[in-house]
Design a protein with these regions (language model features):
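Active-site histidine-anchored catalytic micro-motif
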Residues: 112-180, 282-286
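Solvent-exposed alpha-helices and their adjacent loops that cap or buttress functional pockets
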Residues: 24-26, 134-137, 159-160, 184-188, ...
Length: 326
């Protein structure tokens, strides 16, 4: 059960309310709300508290008030009997298998899955679920909106941080046991991956990315020029479904002052909304994930929660109003 909100909605009254939108398929759209309240394999710790903070701030009520037919929230869980001490990546994969189960169920009964994730490692389970529910052979594209590339492997990473590896794992360049545990049988083609809002890459990581077909649209070019629009158009033509992943550290630290991996010169909330909307309007988005919200640190955490709510409220009408993928 989610505790009463400590995020004052009167104080945060400038959070835009989602507006009802006609989908052409009836009065509402089905969205399954999935939460993955974990940092790695630890429930509710640090970033793992982010999903519950969004629930407490009233996100489900806001969605329903906008006419969204919302099921859930359904929480992905790591069975304690399957958790092995010292095998974090394998544990994350097993958690991902439950995330995949929930996402696949959402795709089979509704239009899309909105995933509130603790950290970026949840993405492997989300994509696994999309692939399990999709027609065999259907291409799935990934739009990764993040200050960081998250394209490290154990060989390229300076830190060994697992949260810096999810995109490389999705692409099949690392983590085979992790992918297998999550049920992701086939990797995502690198030509079907767009990194957007990127502004911090490790040297070896960038070299690895440049050796692939992954397209990078840096933060400095995201809202200027046609690069992002062209990248999304190309992805839409090549893929049956898209997965939109948003790491909130793509925002400038003044909007997410509690971010665990802050990166200067980030996006404004309006720029993030514009970026998300461009993807959501394609009609190909099957799942959206919001990750890396740190609600701790007192007033700084509260401001970060408010920023996340603003971004979701600003962008989601484009998803509601656009027919989704089959």
């Amino acid at each position: 059960m989610v505790a009463p909100s400590r995020y004052n909605r009167d104080v945060d009254s400038d959070i835009p309310r989602l507006q009802p939108a006609s989908t052409g398929r009836g009065s509402s759209m089905r969205v399954d709300l999935v939460t993955v309240p974990y940092r790695y394999d630890e429930r509710g710790e640090g970033l793992g508290a982010g999903p519950d903070a969004l629930l407490a701030a009233g996100l489900p009520e806001q969605l329903r008030a906008a006419g969204v037919e919302l099921t859930g929230p359904h929480e992905a869980r790591l069975n304690p009997s399957l958790q092995e001490e010292g095998r974090t990546a394998l544990n994350i994969g097993r958690l991902g298998a439950d995330t995949a189960r929930l996402v696949a169920a959402a795709r089979r009964i509704g239009d899309g899955a909105l995933v509130l994730a603790g950290d970026d490692t949840a993405a492997i389970g989300v994509v696994s679920g999309l692939k399990q529910a999709a027609v065999e052979g259907a291409a799935i594209g990934v739009v990764w909106v993040d200050a960081h590339g998250d394209f490290n492997t154990p060989e390229t990473s300076f830190s060994g941080i697992l949260a810096g590896m999810p995109v490389a794992i999705l692409a099949g360049l690392a983590g085979p046991l992790w992918r297998e545990a999550a049920g992701l049988a086939t990797p995502v083609e690198t030509e079907h991956i767009v990194l957007a809002g990127t502004r911090e890459l490790d040297e070896k990581e960038e070299k690895l990315i440049r050796s692939t077909d992954v397209q990078i649209v840096p933060a400095t070019e995201l809202c200027d020029g046609d690069d992002f629009a062209q990248a999304i158009d190309r992805l839409t033509r090549r893929c049956a479904q898209l997965y939109l992943h948003v790491d909130l550290d793509v925002l400038d630290p003044r909007f997410v002052p509690s971010a665990s991996t802050p990166s200067a010169n980030g996006l404004s909330i309006d720029e993030l909304v514009t970026t998300m909307t461009a993807v959501l309007q394609t009609g190909k988005v099957a799942a959206v994930a919001i990750s890396s919200l740190n609600p701790g640190a007192g007033a700084r955490g509260e401001r970060s929660v408010t920023s996340a709510m603003k971004a979701i409220a600003g962008a989601l009408p484009a998803w509601i109003a656009t027919p989704g993928p089959c």
